[in-house]
């Protein structure tokens, strides 16, 4: 019984030491990352004489589109998808 209690105590100390090491590593990684702006929308304007993939999606010339991080605004429709820093987001165009 004493052996079991001793092994349990050693296991708890080892787990606590490992947890402290992981939290320090996470703090170091967070400190190394550059600050990012939360709302970075990318606006796209399609010129009249420019043939592009947007026109193939049904987006007409002269339409302003934006790559949104969340949902499209009420006066916009989703015309496809785009990427911001490697993540896929909706491509929203004004109606």
From Swiss-Prot:
<protein>
    <recommendedName>
        <fullName>Corticostatin-3</fullName>
    </recommendedName>
</protein>
<dbReference type="GO" id="GO:0050832">
    <property type="term" value="P:defense response to fungus"/>
</dbReference>
<dbReference type="InterPro" id="IPR006080">
    <property type="entry name" value="Beta/alpha-defensin_C"/>
</dbReference>
<feature type="signal peptide">
    <location>
        <begin position="1"/>
        <end position="19"/>
    </location>
</feature>
<dbReference type="GO" id="GO:0051607">
    <property type="term" value="P:defense response to virus"/>
</dbReference>
<dbReference type="GO" id="GO:0051673">
    <property type="term" value="P:disruption of plasma membrane integrity in another organism"/>
</dbReference>
<dbReference type="InterPro" id="IPR006081">
    <property type="entry name" value="Alpha-defensin_C"/>
</dbReference>
<feature type="disulfide bond">
    <location>
        <begin position="65"/>
        <end position="93"/>
    </location>
</feature>
<feature type="disulfide bond">
    <location>
        <begin position="67"/>
        <end position="82"/>
    </location>
</feature>
<dbReference type="GO" id="GO:0005615">
    <property type="term" value="C:extracellular space"/>
</dbReference>
<keyword id="KW-0051">Antiviral defense</keyword>
<keyword id="KW-0295">Fungicide</keyword>
<keyword id="KW-1015">Disulfide bond</keyword>
<keyword id="KW-0732">Signal</keyword>
<dbReference type="GO" id="GO:0002227">
    <property type="term" value="P:innate immune response in mucosa"/>
</dbReference>
<dbReference type="GO" id="GO:0019731">
    <property type="term" value="P:antibacterial humoral response"/>
</dbReference>
<feature type="propeptide">
    <location>
        <begin position="20"/>
        <end position="62"/>
    </location>
</feature>
<feature type="disulfide bond">
    <location>
        <begin position="72"/>
        <end position="92"/>
    </location>
</feature>
<keyword id="KW-0044">Antibiotic</keyword>
<dbReference type="GO" id="GO:0031012">
    <property type="term" value="C:extracellular matrix"/>
</dbReference>
<dbReference type="Pfam" id="PF00323">
    <property type="entry name" value="Defensin_1"/>
</dbReference>
<keyword id="KW-0929">Antimicrobial</keyword>
<dbReference type="Pfam" id="PF00879">
    <property type="entry name" value="Defensin_propep"/>
</dbReference>
<dbReference type="GO" id="GO:0061844">
    <property type="term" value="P:antimicrobial humoral immune response mediated by antimicrobial peptide"/>
</dbReference>
<keyword id="KW-0964">Secreted</keyword>
<dbReference type="GO" id="GO:0050830">
    <property type="term" value="P:defense response to Gram-positive bacterium"/>
</dbReference>
<dbReference type="InterPro" id="IPR016327">
    <property type="entry name" value="Alpha-defensin"/>
</dbReference>
<dbReference type="GO" id="GO:0071222">
    <property type="term" value="P:cellular response to lipopolysaccharide"/>
</dbReference>
<dbReference type="GO" id="GO:0050829">
    <property type="term" value="P:defense response to Gram-negative bacterium"/>
</dbReference>
<comment type="similarity">
    <text>Belongs to the alpha-defensin family.</text>
</comment>
<dbReference type="InterPro" id="IPR002366">
    <property type="entry name" value="Alpha-defensin_N"/>
</dbReference>
<dbReference type="GO" id="GO:0031640">
    <property type="term" value="P:killing of cells of another organism"/>
</dbReference>
<keyword id="KW-0211">Defensin</keyword>
<comment type="function">
    <text>This peptide has antibiotic, anti-fungi and antiviral activity. It also inhibits corticotropin (ACTH) stimulated corticosterone production.</text>
</comment>
């Amino acid at each position: 019984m004493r052996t079991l209690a001793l092994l349990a105590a050693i296991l708890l100390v080892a787990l606590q030491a490992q947890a402290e090491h992981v939290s320090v590593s996470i703090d170091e990684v967070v400190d190394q990352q550059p600050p990012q702006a939360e709302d970075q929308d990318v606006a796209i304007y399609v010129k009249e004489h420019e043939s592009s993939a947007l026109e193939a999606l049904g987006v007409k010339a002269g339409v302003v589109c934006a790559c949104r991080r969340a949902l499209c605004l009420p006066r916009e429709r989703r015309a496809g998808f785009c990427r911001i820093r490697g993540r896929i987001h909706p491509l929203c165009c004004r109606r």
